[in-house]
Amino acid sequence: MDKVLQGYIDKLNKLNFKDMYEGDFFLTWEKTDDEIEAVFTVADALRYMREHNISTKVFESGLGISLFRDNSTRTRFSFASACNLLGLEVQDLDEGKSQIAHGETVRETANMISFMADVIGIRDDMYIGKGNKYMHDVVDAVTEGHKDGVLEQKPTLVNLQCDIDHPTQCMADMLHIINTFGGVENLKGKKVAMTWAYSPSYGKPLSVPQGVIGLMTRFGMDVVLAHPEGYEVSLPSPLKISRVRALTWFVLP
């Protein structure tokens, strides 16, 4: 066994992430510290394996389903690359060319696309109060389908950005910061400055800063958010009490 890989395995053996198995990933603040650290550790291990030409295939066959209800470049290609890295083929669902346009329900669509699927990645960030709820509706539908014997397995859902959080991007940013400063233990007190960015939808500019606030303050970092007046983020209740002290507001003129 490669010594570096063994080090990653030893680290994982010290973490409790058993509840993530066959689970879904909606929001980072729903995960424990051990679970977040396990994601970072596996990501580092996969990168090391890729760099050293060691196979990362977990699946011999299977599908990764992507559904983008908003435009995407980086996340779309990242999801496809990740599926390929693990041995899954990607099928992208175009709602405009599906029966959804003719009134097919979430339950019908979710179960249809889930045959032979191991993971579903969804981006739905356009409207406040809609995206995260839709993802939960999909999970409820495939869970019921599996329970009723329609599906032989329940695919895992990964949030590729909703109206509340952008967990994959925020964790990728966080891991880069961890590697830059030489470990999680070196992040406390570091300051992150973030500025509001224009988007045609209101939901997208909210989910990224909320995700950064929710994840980076968790590791003791100070987040400064600059935004126009009237564009304050609406922190989900679990974050309001525990993280607000590490957040500074700066209103742009």
Language-model regions, residue ranges each:
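Short, charged helix-to-loop "capping" segments that act as catalytic/coupling loops
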Residues: 32, 125-133, 144, 197-209
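Generic secondary-structure signature for well-ordered alpha-helical cores
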Residues: 41-48, 88, 118, 122, ...
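Short, conserved catalytic or adaptor-binding loops enriched in Gly and charged residues
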Residues: 18, 142-152, 238-244
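Glycine-rich phosphate/diphosphate-binding loop of Rossmann-like nucleotide-binding domains
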Residues: 69-84, 178-253
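A generic local structural motif
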Residues: 50-53, 106-108, 250-252
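Phosphate/diphosphate ligand-binding glycine-rich loop within oxidoreductases
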Residues: 57-178
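Generic alpha-helical secondary structure signal
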Residues: 33-37, 104-107, 133, 236-239
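Positively charged, low-complexity intrinsically disordered leader regions
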Residues: 1-77, 81
